[in-house]
């Protein structure tokens, strides 16, 4: 997917008291939440907040230092950013009540052009083609995406996927977290309609199985009712919690009302739903096709490797699948439908044989959690995030200890003791916790309500900050 960055304009009304009342670290988190594209090592950006009561300058680079400075008092907001420390891409002075969306639409060209400064040279050619196409063919969709918090967060999330071995899977997880109508519209233009983003080719990981390994008969009417996915092969598509699917026949097709949960980083979740329709191959009962879909023109082909439907607790349907869409040709996986929420152990030998018929090992499948319990209380989610922060601090201390032992003479009297570092780390963590809990009912809650962001979206942007409940 294409990556974008944006210039930042923040009004005094939005950040009243922030610069004067919070630490560098907390202010950085607040700005990063509002503007996730800021924190790039390869770029230096300048934001100025000018008003009668507030004056602060933020320079963000490798050191990420916050400085406060005095400036002439005015009723205007001056905003801009620089790339490579010298070339000014965008700089504008606008009235305080200016509609920011209008400004962003005007600056779309500069926004996408800035992508090149944060992308590796190996990606430059493809990035040039993609950005040129987006500027020419998807200007409106791109502008809407930048102006939408969820879509902008999705783009920020996609940046973390660059050059990873699991880049495509990472991108899909970003889509799971931040999917909404604006994201869909952007993808439809960039991927399907104008094909600005090249399709990922089939690498043969999920080949079409031999017809001889499929079931010889399958009555779709027997598939009526509720089924759990209790085990899945592909962690990207198959291993979500609380996968409860309900099927019925309609006009000769099998219609599935699907639901599943997406975990948020703090241990919470939100629920996704979808409706899919399958037609049975007239000559191969064990093959079901889900084609003719508008979104990304996706097509999923199901191959039923084994099944037993006898109105018993251990009923099951074992499905291997492969698919294609405008973004990816040849994705696939396998999953087990069961009437029970967990895998009946007595059917495992049958599942092992069926998985081996397509070159897979059922022992490597992931058992899903279908208890479908309530969301953990806020206290537990806070504790989980704090524990993760503590583990990170301890890891950093251990790394420091190794460096000190390896070069003790050079460190001399200037290094801090490990216990001092550990104590300061915990104190900083405690300050962050107290601040976010204290401010949850003030500025941050008001901002969240205005943006209508979900807890998972906010947590993704805050990184290691404390989790926040979903706001309805």
UniProtKB/Swiss-Prot annotation:
Entry EC number(s): 1.23.5.1
More info: The amount of VDE in vivo is estimated to be 1 molecule per 20-100 electron transport chains.
Resulting phenotype, residue 138 to S: Loss of activity
GO CC terms of this entry: chloroplast thylakoid membrane
PANTHER family in UniProt: VIOLAXANTHIN DE-EPOXIDASE, CHLOROPLASTIC (PTHR33970:SF1), VIOLAXANTHIN DE-EPOXIDASE, CHLOROPLASTIC-RELATED (PTHR33970)
UniProt keyword annotations, A-Z: Chloroplast, Coiled coil, Disulfide bond, Membrane, Oxidoreductase, Plastid, Thylakoid, Transit peptide
Disulphide bond pairs: 133-151, 138-145, 157-174, 161-170, 189-196, 242-372
Effect of residue 297 to R: 55% loss of activity. Total loss of activity. Total loss of activity
Membrane-related topology note: Peripheral membrane protein
Effect of residue 291 to A: 99% loss of activity. Total loss of activity
Catalyzed reactions per annotation: all-trans-violaxanthin + 2 L-ascorbate = all-trans-zeaxanthin + 2 L-dehydroascorbate + 2 H2O
Organism: Spinacia oleracea (Spinach)
Protein name: Violaxanthin de-epoxidase, chloroplastic
Consequence the record notes for mutating residue 161 to S: Loss of activity
Description of activity control: Irreversibly inhibited by DTT and iodoacetamide at pH 5.7 or pH 5.2, but not at pH 7.2. Regulated through Ca(2+) gating of H(+) flux at the CFoH(+) channel. Requires the presence of lipids forming reverse hexagonal structures such as monogalactosyldiacylglyceride (MGDG) or phosphatidylethanolamine. A negative curvature elastic stress in the thylakoid lipid bilayer is required for VDE1 activity.
Known function: Part of the xanthophyll (or violaxanthin) cycle for controlling the concentration of zeaxanthin in chloroplasts. Catalyzes the two-step mono de-epoxidation reaction. Stereospecific for all-trans xanthophylls. Zeaxanthin induces the dissipation of excitation energy in the chlorophyll of the light-harvesting protein complex of photosystem II.
UniProt PTM: Disulfide bonds. Reduction of the disulfides results in loss of a rigid structure, a decrease in thermal stability of 15 degrees Celsius and a loss of activity.
Enzyme class name: oxidoreductase
Family: Belongs to the calycin superfamily. Lipocalin family.
Gene Ontology BP terms: chlorophyll metabolic process; xanthophyll cycle
Coiled-coil segments on the chain, per record: 379-462
Effect of residue 242 to S: Loss of activity
């Amino acid at each position: 997917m294409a990556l974008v960055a944006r210039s930042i304009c923040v009004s005094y009304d939005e950040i009243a008291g922030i610069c004067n009342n919070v630490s560098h670290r907390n202010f950085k988190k607040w700005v990063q939440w509002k503007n996730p594209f800021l924190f790039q090592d390869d770029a230096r950006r300048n934001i100025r907040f000018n008003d009668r009561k507030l004056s602060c300058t933020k320079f963000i680079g490798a050191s990420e230092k916050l400085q406060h400075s005095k400036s002439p008092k005015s009723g205007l907001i001056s905003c801009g950013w620089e790339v490579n420390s010298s070339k000014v891409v965008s700089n504008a002075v606008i009235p305080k009540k200016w509609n920011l969306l209008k400004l962003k639409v005007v600056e779309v060209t500069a926004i996408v052009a800035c992508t090149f400064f944060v992308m590796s040279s190996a990606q430059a050619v493809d990035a040039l083609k993609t950005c040129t196409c987006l500027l020419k063919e998807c200007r409106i969709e791109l502008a809407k995406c930048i102006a939408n918090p969820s879509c902008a967060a999705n783009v920020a999330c996609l940046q973390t996927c660059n050059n990873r071995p699991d880049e495509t899977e990472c991108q899909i997880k970003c889509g799971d977290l931040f999917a909404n109508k604006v994201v869909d519209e952007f993808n439809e233009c960039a991927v399907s309609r104008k094909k600005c983003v090249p399709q990922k080719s089939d690498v043969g990981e999920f080949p079409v199985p031999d017809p001889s390994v499929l079931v010889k008969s399958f009555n779709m009417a027997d598939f009526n009712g509720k089924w759990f996915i209790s085990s899945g092969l592909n962690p990207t598509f198959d291993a979500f919690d609380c996968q409860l699917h309900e099927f019925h026949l309609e006009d000769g097709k099998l219609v599935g009302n699907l639901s599943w949960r997406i975990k948020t980083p703090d241990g919470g979740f939100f629920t996704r739903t979808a409706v899919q329709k399958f037609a049975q191959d007239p000559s191969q009962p064990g093959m079901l096709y889900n084609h003719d879909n508008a979104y990304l023109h996706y097509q999923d082909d199901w191959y039923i490797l084994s099944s037993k439907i006898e109105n018993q607790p251990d009923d099951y349907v074992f499905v291997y699948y492969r698919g294609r869409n405008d973004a990816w040709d040849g994705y696939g996986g396998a999953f087990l439908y069961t009437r029970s929420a967990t895998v009946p152990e007595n059917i495992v030998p049958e599942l092992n044989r069926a998985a081996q018929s397509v070159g897979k090992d059922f022992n490597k499948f992931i058992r899903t959690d279908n208890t479908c319990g309530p969301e953990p209380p806020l206290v537990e989610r806070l504790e989980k995030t704090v524990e993760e922060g503590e583990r990170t601090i301890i890891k950093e201390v251990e790394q420091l200890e190794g460096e000190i032992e390896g070069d003790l003479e050079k460190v001399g009297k200037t290094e801090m003791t490990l216990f001092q570092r550990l104590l300061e780390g915990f104190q900083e963590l405690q300050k962050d916790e107290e601040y976010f809990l204290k401010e949850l009912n003030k500025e941050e809650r008001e901002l969240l309500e205005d943006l209508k962001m979900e807890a998972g979206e906010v947590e993704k942007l805050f990184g290691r900050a404390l989790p926040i409940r979903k706001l309805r």
